[in-house]
Amino acid sequence: MKINFQKRLLALAIAAVMTLSLAACGQKNGPAASSGSQGAATGSAEVQSGGQEGIVAFTDQAGRQVELEGPAQTVVSCYYVTTYAAIALGVADRVVGLEKKADTRPIYHMAASALLEKPQVGTMKELDVEAVAALAPDLVVMPKKLMDYADTLEELGFQVMVVEPETHEGLVTMLELLGQACGVEDRAAQLTNYYEEQLDRMAQLTEGTERPLVYLAGNSSYLTAAPDAMYQSSLIEGAGGTNVAAGLEGDYWAEVSYESVLAMAPEVVIIPAGAEYTVEDILGDPQLASLPAVQSGAVYAMPSGIEEWDSPIPSGILGTMWLTSVLHEDVYPFADFVADAQDFYQTFYGFQLDGSLITK
């Protein structure tokens, strides 16, 4: 909802006080949702008509009702996933504030450098309510992990959309909702249709093929793995592989021992884009010398200079496609993937991606 000048002043006055109280509240009641949760994706949207012509009303992914006077023209994105989505949906110019550490995201430099000049309002752990209020956005978009801040912002007169794109389905729903909120439904449909079409295409290409045993390691250590409840597990399955860590409990990176990794006996090991270690670290670890993937040299690192394709982001479908080309190059050659990835960025991000950045 757009707020008037008087409400802006009220927001600024209250925000400083609310920031302190909210921080205390968040420590006691912070949500347990994690970035890898495979929770149910909710959310629906519709444009109201009749007596409320032009009103955009929808239910967000936390089951909350959101109502805008019209398509949002100014947006604060508190989450890199939704900032990425704004770029892909062609509304990056409407983002007036975003998450911190924006300069560490290569895609901002490549596709939307103006974002680097925008105010940064918070992290996945805390949000600067006063900074958000000062920007007076039509819409604030935040991950479920920050949902404690939603009520505070609404009390200040702002509309808040909570998202949870932690599954393939949840990501598609998030894109549809953000497209609806910004009045770019056709663009969102184009993006989600591409996503679904490529999932189907990868499934068809790998149908009837052997499904290699895959170990997808975490960012901080290769002695962490993705349980079945994580988005990363669906990436492996969608690429025609079998997640050897699927039986682990939890919805976030699970710590494992050397003995456990050896018992899983993966034929392929995948290192994510944000890893703090290298292929050479794994190949050179004497405690993994008997691992099938190490013995055959089948340890691959996802490209690190573009986006985090192992994450639930608009380009996340490229993670499934990249892995398909690694696991099943006989049916989907790596050169074909490179061409597809370049076409994706040209179509949805508006720039020609340097093919040398696409590695394995």
Model-derived features with residue positions:
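Proline-aspartate-enriched helix->loop->beta-strand connector
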Residues: 121-124, 129-142, 158, 257-273
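A short, structured surface patch at a secondary-structure boundary
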Residues: 77-135, 139, 145, 244
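Alpha-helical, coiled-coil/dimerization segments enriched in small aliphatic residues
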Residues: 225-253, 257
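N-terminal low-complexity, Pro/Thr/Ser-rich intrinsically disordered segments
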Residues: 37-69
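Sec-dependent N-terminal signal peptides of Gram-positive bacterial secreted proteins and lipoproteins
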Residues: 2-29
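Structural recognition of the beta-strand scaffold that forms the well-ordered cores
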Residues: 76-78, 96-99, 139-143, 160-164, ...
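Bacterial lipoprotein signal-peptidase II cleavage site
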Residues: 23-42
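Extracytoplasmic substrate-binding proteins
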Residues: 54-55, 67, 148-224, 245-247, ...
